[in-house]
Every structure is written in C-alpha cells, then in structure tokens.
UniProtKB/Swiss-Prot annotation:
The chain crosses the membrane at residues 12-32. Pfam families: p450. Heme binds at C436. It is found in: Membrane. Its EC number is 1.14.14.116. It comes from Aspergillus parasiticus (strain ATCC 56775 / NRRL 5862 / SRRC 143 / SU-1). This is Averantin hydroxylase.
Amino acid sequence: MGGDGWPSDGHILLLIVLTVLTPPSLALYRLWIHPLRSYPGPRWWAIWRGPYILSNIRGNLVRDLQRLHQQFGPVVRIAPNELSFIVPEAASPIYTSNPEFPKDPMHLPPFHNGTPGILAADHAHHRRYRRLLAFSFSDKGLRHERSLIERSIDLLITQLHENCGQGPLDLALWFNWATFDIIGDLAFGDSFGCLENVQTHPWIASIQGNVKLIPILNAFRRYRLDGLLRLLGSRKLLEQRRRNAQFTTDQVDRRLKNSSTPRGDIWDAVLAQKPDGEPPMTRDEMISNASAIVLAGSETSATLLSGCTWLLLKNPSHLHQLTSRIRSQFTHASEIDSQSVSRVEGLQAVLEESLRLYPPVPMQSNRIVPQAGAYIAGGWVPGGTSVGLQQFVACRSSSNFHRPDEFLPERWQGQGEFAHDRREVSQPFSIGPRNCIGRQLAYVEMRLILVKLLWHFDLRLDTTRMKDTDWLAEQGIWILWDKKPLWVTLEPRNE
C-alpha cells in the first residue's frame, strides 16, 4: 500500500498483469498440459465451458454433440473437465462400477427444499429410497395398481371417441394428459382430472417450465452466482419453478393428512414400511421424491408415445403391419389389458426402435470419475473428470447402427443387415443400480395406450397443420424434449 492507504503503483501493475495473463495462461494449460489434453474436441470447448453452457441454454446441446462426435469420433472433450462417449463399452464403467461413480452435481436439477430426491441422492440415500419405493414399481406392485392405470387409459379412449369428430387432435397433448392422470392416481391416489376436464393441469406447465430453467440454474450454480438469477432470470420460468415446488408440497401434505388410510398409491407401501435400522422417509424427502416421480412418470412416457406415433405415421407400412397384428389378436376391446398386450407380435420391437430414435431423456446423467482414475472404453480418464454416454447421439451413430436414422423395427431381431448393430448401446432407462425405477410402469403404459389407440382408431397425419414439418427434428432439448403439437386425424375403425 502507498502512504495514503491506496494500492501502490507496483500492486496496480501486478493486478493488471495478472488480469491480462491469466486467461491466456489458463487456455494454454488446458490445451497443452491438462490431463485431458490428448482427447479430441473443439479447442474453444476445451478452453472454457462457455460454448457448452450457451448451447445447453438454447436447447441445442444434444445436436451440437452429435455434430462434434461426427467430426471428432467416439470420445470427445466437450468442456475443460468433461468427456462425452458414444461407445457401448463406456456404459459399464460409468454406470455400473462398484464403488459407483457419483453423479455430477452440476448436471443434476437443483432441489428447492435442500433435500435431494431419488434422482440426485448420494449412494446411501438412493439405496434407501429405492428400497422404500421398490414394491410400488415392481411387477407385483403394478398388478395391484393395474385397475388405476387401465381406468385412465379407458377414459383416454372414450374422450378420443367423443372429440375426434371435431377435427384433428394434438395427440402429444392427449398423451400428456393421460400419463399425468395416471401418475396422479399412482403418486397421490387421485387423478389430476386432465382427461375428465379436457384441459391441461397447471402443474404440467410448471413442470415443463421448471425443466427449461434447469440449464440456466446449473450455469449460475457452477459459478456461484445463484443470487443473480433472481435479477437476471426469466420471471415466467422462475414463477413456474416456484409453482412446481408448491404443487408438490401441497399434494404431499394432503397425502400425509390421510397417512393412516390406504389409497392404493405408491405411498401406501412407503408409509407402511418400518425400515430395520433406517429412518422412514421424511416429509421433505417425500416432497423431493414426489417431484421426481411425477416428472419421470408422466412426461417421459408421453414423450415416447408421441415419438412412436410420429414414427409410425411417417412409416405407414410399419403402422399398417402393427395395426393389423393388433386387430387380428383381439376380437373385442375387453380382451386388451396390461397382460395381453405384451404378446402382440412386433410391438416390443416398435417400442425399442422408437426409444432408440427418440429416447425420452436424450442425455444420460453425468458421473464423476473417482480420484484414483479409471479406464473407460480403453482409455485412461483421470479422477475428477465428468463423463457421460450420450444416448441420442450414440443411437444415431453409424458406428453403432446400420442405417441409423431410419425407423426399422426389424433391426431388433438382430439378423441380416442388422446383425452387427450394437443394440446394447440403446439404454433409454439407463443401467446399473441407478437405472429407472419406473421402467416397468413405462412399458405397461406405452404398450396399453398404443395397442388400444390402434385397435380403436385409424390414424392419419393432418397434412394441413403438419405440412413440411419434421416434427422430431424441430424440437429443442432442455434435458427433455420440447414437444410440439402432433396433429393427427382419428377415425373410429369400422368394426
């Protein structure tokens, strides 16, 4: 300091020098000295995270990563300390190692009440949550809940019959209504009434707004600028996030007031269990888990059904074949239930191919390599690196699939020209101990809704509203797909 308390000229000069030299020095380090220097990728992305963050906020990240993998190969450095993989050999070490690679907190949705749910919990809490919720999502549990699921799907078909005469319907919206009502019944013992009232519940809009806000929240969290978000963030998105938290809290509190009365929902088993040596689920834990369950249990199934319908409509020979098989197997609508639909020939292949081309969660969550480091897909990755297998990009890569952009359900037979397809890379529900607990529920919903829809109706894309539209390609991705309306003409079949 100078005699008057101000910094001396030397200190000022040092500050200027550091300010000027630090960015280029950091860039040189990350390009030429950093442990990830040997991995290919765009230089700007390797130097700083700005391009990644901007791409993510704009909803372009998945397609930008697809372009980068086409340019640089199966492993790409997409940030100073992050690698992206698309080879199936990467899945096992990243997602099934024991001890596990912990989730990257900067890739997780922040939790509003300070308590992580099943999607973000550490290993111990995740294992406990999963054990408490396991029965409700098991085959046995779903058999108990079958009547709730089938009731909502029957109402969907009834409402489609009543409304299809008015003109084309937005099936993406109707699928959202159906799966949201189903998860309302399963999660809280009470439907949200979307199908009954033929309108969107406010919670759906708040969920979708909250998902779009997550990349922005994580960008601010990464640089510890959370407080600035209230000043700079979209008021609409922030309000939707607040409303999403409030909806969840209100539903859980309402359920806890009737905790002693069985309601046929997932909380019956949770509230009834007395864990040996472990505490039961707290109110805050129930709120965080309910939020995750409602999102994962409604939005993802509706997304796949929308994508599957689009792909079938764009590939009429496959639509005709599946429709014929469904109608030849079932003489009466009453024969269609959650058990019988699993026996429809070719149905599973159609769903798997739809999941490959249009995975509801295009990016799997990133993990952090333990400090000791690890070999992933034949290469050494130092500890502390964020790693992930990009589901959408991997499934659209010609290195994994023959004719990767075409809808070809027959590829799942693994024969002929598709014998060398690396089908194991398609893991839309993830793998390992943190795979999707609702996988069985999703398949039950998807099979039952699709079979009933095609049994009752002939489908035709509304060319007036969908003319020259590549419905799938035009969607942005903010963790989940930003689905556009899917206008379809439904004609009740001539039985």
